[in-house]
Regions:
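Low-complexity, highly charged intrinsically disordered N-terminal segments
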Residues: 18-82
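Active-site regions of oxyanion-processing enzymes, predominantly non-cytosolic
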Residues: 216-233
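A long, amphipathic alpha-helix that forms part
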Residues: 239-273
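Active-site neighborhoods of enzymes that stabilize oxyanions during catalysis
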Residues: 139, 233-234, 290-291, 296-379
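Active-site nucleophile/metal-coordination loop of metallo-enzymes that catalyze phosphate/sulfate
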Residues: 86-106, 120-214, 329-340, 350, ...
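Short secondary-structure boundary/capping segments
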Residues: 126-133, 242-248, 283-301
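Single conserved hydrophobic/aromatic residue that forms the stacking wall/gate
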Residues: 1-5, 9
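Beta-strand elements within well-structured catalytic alpha/beta cores of enzymes
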Residues: 107-126, 227-230, 265, 271-283, ...
């Protein structure tokens, strides 16, 4: 749009997004549609012009100004937060307690399918596709994700942990990147299976499940109260700079594979399922302007982890270019008193660093990164 049109747009967003809770509400009810329309357009364009490196410039520009307008409006609300928490909005870190405990407590069973980086707008389309199967009904809800919005922390947040303990039960491990749930590593299927074992649960990879005969799926489901099925296609492509621009094609693959997982589970007598994810993502199929890169770098006692959209360190110095949260403000534990701090570049800004792509990113606090789907599927 012309700059006049985009100014009107920006004002409209600033007026509408008038509280942190309202921002999440608005994204989940309306604003996600812009991200979906962009994904559908880019997918269609690339099919029609396989040789073209970049997508139609006008579209890119209008999507860029939309992302910036929303990013700024949302940032104004995030800046007001004392801690990473939203009144009356379900939290990803309460997922097990809220969605699974009551089911298991009532002596019923449930399966949870966790698809890495299945963002909210994609889950909306997935729900429509599952509904077309005519054997299932779906109900899509939202929850706000953990911060930083990256795989290890999001995956850990979805597991059973003790929300009533005096300390927050999620903490970074020794490498300050892997995550501990009540002191145990939550990295990888094996460790997650062990944590789920405490509540009579099991974990399996989607690829493994899809190869099973239905009699074996029945036996597996009979043997546990809750079954977690892990799926990773979107993030596997998005996180590599060689394949990040295939991320929308991976959404298509994901819709097909998750529909197959749902059918496979249903054939194994699973009537009750939830599809969710660890985090969402931001994607733009064009190179970033200089203005979209932060000129600042994080400073502090120590910088342990630096990614495009977040930094984890010790006593990081507050800076206007970032939002800065202590572990406690982010709902995390700091068991060794290391002054754990996280910093997130404002709006949709990226940090400069060597390697890794910049079109597909996550880890920050932007709405497409942190509004996480909770899709109930019943047979």
């Amino acid at each position: 749009p012309s700059s006049a049109a985009s100014d009107v747009y920006k004002r409209q967003l600033l007026i509408s997004v008038d509280s942190p809770e309202r921002g999440i509400e608005l994204y989940a009810s309306e604003l996600y549609k812009a991200d979906r329309a962009y994904r559908e357009y880019v997918t269609a364009w690339r099919r029609a012009h396989p040789e073209a490196r970049s997508v139609d410039t006008d579209l890119q520009e209008s999507y860029r100004s939309y992302q910036h307008a929303l990013g700024q409006a949302w940032q104004m609300q995030v800046d007001k937060l004392e801690r990473w928490s939203f009144k009356g909005v379900d939290a990803q870190s309460d997922f097990y307690e809220r969605e699974i405990s009551p089911v298991v407590g009532a002596k019923k069973k449930i399966a949870v399918i966790v698809s890495d980086a299945l963002r909210y707008e994609a889950a909306q389309e997935l729900a429509e596709r599952i509904n077309r199967e005519n054997r299932f009904s779906t109900d899509l809800k939202k929850q706000y994700g953990v911060l930083p919005s990256y795989t290890q922390l999001g995956m850990a947040a979805l597991l059973p942990h003790d929300p009533s303990s005096a300390h927050d039960s999620l903490a970074f491990g020794k490498d300050h990147y892997g995550v501990l749930v009540d002191g145990r590593s939550a990295t990888g299927t094996e460790n997650r299976d062990a944590i789920l074992g405490d509540v009579g649960g099991k974990a399996i990879q989607a690829g493994e499940l899809l190869k099973m005969k239905s009699i074996d799926v029945k036996a597996l489901y009979r043997s546990c109260n809750v079954l977690y099925v892990y799926h990773n296609v979107i993030d596997a492509h998005g996180d590599s700079d060689k394949t990040e621009d295939e991320v929308f094609d991976s959404c298509e693959t994901t819709f097909r594979e998750l529909t197959d997982v749902v059918k496979k589970l249903a054939g194994g007598n699973v009537n009750n399922m939830i599809i969710t994810s660890d985090h969402g993502f931001l994607y733009q199929g064009f190179d970033l302007d200089d203005s979209e890169w932060l000129s600042t770098q994080p400073q502090g006692d120590e910088v342990w982890v630096k990614k495009r959209r977040f930094t984890i360190g010790s006593r990081l110095a507050p800076d206007r270019a970032f939002i800065t949260f202590t572990a406690a403000q982010a709902g995390l534990d700091d068991p060794d008193g290391e002054g754990v701090t996280i910093q997130i570049p404002n709006s949709i800004m990226r940090l400069r660093k060597q390697g890794t792509g910049s079109h597909y990113v996550h880890g920050g606090s932007a709405l497409p990164e942190i509004v996480v789907p909770v899709l109930h599927v019943s047979k």
